[in-house]
Amino acid sequence: MTANKPLLVVIVGPTAVGKTELSIELAKKIGGEIISGDSIQVYRGMDIGTAKVTKEEMQGVPHYLIDILDPDEPFSAFAFKERAQKLITEITERGHIPIIAGGTGLYIQSLIYDYPFDKEEISPEKEQEVKEKMAQLESLSNEALHDYLKSFDPDSAEDIHPNNRKRVLRAVEYYLKTKKLLSYRKKTVQFTENYDTLLIGVEMSREILYQRINCRVDSMLEHGLLQEVEQLMNQGYTSCQSMQAIGYKELIPAVNHEIPINQAVDKLKQHSRNYAKRQMTWFKNKMDVQWFDRAQTSLPLILDEITARIKKRRES
């Protein structure tokens, strides 16, 4: 353990690569408890589209931050960090090892580093002004909104894909509230590690991964994904931010009979493959991850290697 910091194991990798299975088997082997790092698995009723772990798959291993909110409730990197930090402390005090399974790059980064979240107080008048401006911007297309961000913060615009509307809006809102550029803030922040973190990455060749993604989408549909989306829409969640997640937004037009189901499925597969590619790029460029090829290395071998590294850290 480094400088008395709690040990934290984080398992990252692209969608459909096998993080869930690895995290559960590792938890069983080392006495771990799992904290989901997924921003959508927190929502009740969004099960099939998020490949949410089932009670049977958990095999008795404790899981946290799953099914804790309704789809219309907000969830952010800051909210994740607050909840996860508390859980890590509790798990460590029980003598177990906390394992973060999956998650977006920002969520993981905000947790393992002393990542600052601005809490600047602004007047009610300014708050209302920003709220009205954001409401106006909501009507813009993804491209137009991205161009607006580019007009005052080109570095953030370059870092954020135009289709990642949530992050674009976050960068715009940050500027409107603080008159500071999010990109400048990121460049000037000095990160301090909160934990003795072992970052484990799972990967495989693009060809194999894309095949797995396509098969997973087909399996989701066979298990009722379309019906899950329709049920969420019937409950009034259609316009919620959570429904903009991959696996849901693509099927809404199909449920509304605006496009054929096969066209929606093709979009879902394409978006999932694109997302997997972005995930790999982010983790390989931004974080010091120890990678294992899941297609080339057996699960027992990976588990033995991770266990050996954990033992080494505990002894150092």
Curated annotation (Swiss-Prot):
**A Gene Ontology biological process annotation?**
tRNA modification
* InterPro entries in alphabetical order: Dimethylallyltransferase, IPT, P-loop_NTPase
Name the residues that span the membrane: none
Q: Which reaction does it catalyse?
A: adenosine(37) in tRNA + dimethylallyl diphosphate = N(6)-dimethylallyladenosine(37) in tRNA + diphosphate
Keyword Transcription listed: no
| Sorted UniProt keywords | ATP-binding, Magnesium, Nucleotide-binding, Transferase, tRNA processing
Q: Does the keyword tRNA processing apply?
A: yes
Region annotated Interaction with substrate tRNA sits at: 38-41
Q: Which cofactor does it need?
A: Mg(2+)
The role this protein plays is: Catalyzes the transfer of a dimethylallyl group onto the adenine at position 37 in tRNAs that read codons beginning with uridine, leading to the formation of N6-(dimethylallyl)adenosine (i(6)A).
Instruction: State whether it acts alone or in a complex, and with which partners, per the record.
Output: Monomer.
Q: Which HAMAP family match?
A: IPP_trans
Q: Which family does it belong to?
A: Belongs to the IPP transferase family.
Protein known as? tRNA dimethylallyltransferase
**What gene is behind this protein?**
miaA
